[in-house]
Amino acid sequence: MQVKITDLTDQLIASYASVGGINHLDGTNLPCKNGIVGITNDLLQLLFPGFFDNKITHSSEIKMETALLMDSVAGRLEDEISKSISYNPPNETSENNTRGEAKELTLQFLSQLPALREILTTDVDAAFDGDPAAKSKEEIIVSYPFIEAISVQRMAHVLYKFEIALL
């Protein structure tokens, strides 16, 4: 007996109803995991310019490149925060209020990036001071995985303080 794709599709669709584990289909979607990963990668680039991408930026272009990346992150982060706000019960606000709140929270979060950089600098310094094998602070940023992990945790903590769930 040959199984057809339509039969397999029907079985998979049936599992959506019985098992769950799917995003909201008939309402506001939850934040997108892949979208959040992309935003996080770009935030790491903003926190550590030149360390999290292959692009070589000249010092004369850093302001423009940073502004472009910041604008891109802001738009995408606002979308994901809006989804998070819509998910948080009880939520009886209109779509316009949700978007406005998301925009404000996005700007508040992004305003914390300079302070996050200062804190992360102390993390890099501590790793460098505590590891006699480390040759430079740049080596710490490039090759020590905890820097990325602590950066993500510190960003998540800021989101938590702003009561932004699911990001």
Question: Could you say what each language-model-derived stretch is?
Answer:
Residues 1-166:
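Terminal amphipathic alpha-helical/low-complexity segments used for targeting or macromolecular assembly
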